[in-house]
Amino acid sequence: MNPDPIAYPHRDEMPGSHRAAERVVPTILAITGPVRSVVDVGGGDGGWLRVFQQHGVEEVLLIDCPEVEPHLVIDRRYLEPCDLSRDLPAPRRFDLALCLECAEHLPAHRAVQLVEWLTKSADIVVFSAAIPGQGGKGHIHLRFPDFWNELFARRGYRRHDVLRPRIVADRAVAWWYRQNTFVFASSGAKLLSGQTEFLPNEFYLIHKDIAENLV
């Protein structure tokens, strides 16, 4: 029996997520180069993975709650249902891992395990999480980027602020993606060279359009 479609609380946010994916996925691939496999943790209906598939990615996996199943825009065989607030499945290796605006929905004590799982799954992680003042439905763990940067650094992953310079002024992309999204990469990861990157002292950079949305 399918889960009740009404039970998934973020269904109204999916159209905006789809628009963002259409704009941002090509930019991600311009930074990473071609990838064959992508896992998305907390990816809702699979909208971001669908765009990656449209760009030639062969293997995708969505990890999210079972309530997303009636809303999927990718084949249901790509969903691994999981209560992210309690546990994650055994990690598998992918070329790229996504975790976008998911971490703030999880209890604070899950943060370390989430980052460990992501870094065990891929050498390149595209990550965003809500910041204090952002507001939003079901947000229980709001942190500034340096909190997450420290957790990734413990795992040997360096922050590359190469995505925000390309999307921060794009109003077709929801402001939280423009503000919060970073690339984290292991020492062995290969990113395309010549990327524009915000300087470390701009780590908390908030675009004037985005500042208007903070509470």
Which residue ranges define each predicted feature?
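Conserved N-terminal segment of class I S-adenosyl-L-methionine
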Residues: 1-98, 109-121, 135, 141-151, ...
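Hydrophobic adenine-recognition pocket in adenosine-nucleotide-binding enzymes
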Residues: 102
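A short His-aromatic
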Residues: 105-106
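Conserved beta-strand signature within the Rossmann-like core of class I S-adenosyl-L-methionine
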Residues: 122-132
